Amino acid sequence: DNFLDPFNIINILRSIAIVTVIAIGVSISLTIGGFDLSVGSTASLANALVISLFVWHGLGTTEAILITLALCTLVGLFNAFLIVVLRIPDMLATLASLFVIQGVAMTYSYGGSITENMVLPSGEMAEGTIPAAFGALGQVPTIVIIMLVVTLIAQLALSFTTHGRRMYAIGGNPEAARLSGLRITRYKVAAYVIASLLAGLGGILLASRIGSSQVNAGGGYLMDAVAAAWIGFSLAGSGKPNALGTLVGAVILGVLSNGLVMLSVPYYAMDIIKGLVLAGALALTYFQRRT
């Protein structure tokens, strides 16, 4: 098989699109000195919500997507409440949130998959269908275009707007940012809401791609998203988290995974390679900070 075959390149781009969107949310939480571990569970929740709105309630594409994204903002507000109001450290707060949201998603979906023509707990048959327009979102080129648009908007917002520079200032030195009059609380809330929105968008794209809701479908994207964010931070981020670097990190992971498959490396060994790459990226990041 030829690695540079156009179909293989398209497959890589399709495979990294969801990871990239979720990882940019992680990167935005990193800009303010935080860290969001709940993005995988949020993606799972969005996956279940959007499919259920089609299959159980018969809503259209636009309504289902908007309702799902609106509900995902509640996850960001919940994270912000734990971190800003209760002052729980970011990683511990979002770890707790990970389990809460995962439980909510499992409970909402009755612990199973949501598909067309499924049998409801009441014994009736679900009559709703997934619109063709929604299914197109998860296909090439639409999913790749969405990934690139999200990357571009996030990169421009972080690099060329006052709010982006303020977020970097808060992440770099919170005390100095506070003394200079920046509203740290407001930016922390915004960062976690945006991270949850992007995780929700990732879950929606996943739902479009697979055409159903699977139990904890977004959970597998957490570590890849974290790895992409940190790899981009260290290798292509100029010493700070950014969307373009995150895209580069996702591409590196996508190429690595694709190459391992072509080399017939067992799937259960791939996490070892990814873990070593992430460890190297983290080591490089902290080495750069010390120097």
Task: List the predicted regions and their residue ranges.
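Single transmembrane alpha-helix segments in multi-pass membrane proteins
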Residues: 1-57, 82-88, 227-243, 276
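Interfacial loop-to-helix junctions that mark the boundaries of transmembrane helices
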Residues: 3-14, 58-63, 131-145, 213-220, ...
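Hydrophobic core segments of alpha-helical transmembrane domains in multi-pass membrane transport
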Residues: 25-26, 98-105, 146-156, 195-202, ...
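Alpha-helical transmembrane segments within multi-pass membrane transporters and channels
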Residues: 58-99, 248-249
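Helix-loop-helix "hairpin" substructures at the membrane interface of multi-pass membrane proteins
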Residues: 59-68, 74-79, 136-213
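Transmembrane helix-bundle core of multi-pass membrane transporters
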Residues: 90-163, 187-190, 209-218, 269
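Cytosolic-side transmembrane-helix boundaries in multi-pass membrane proteins
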Residues: 152, 179-186, 256-291
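Transmembrane alpha-helical segments in multi-pass inner-membrane proteins
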Residues: 199, 209-275
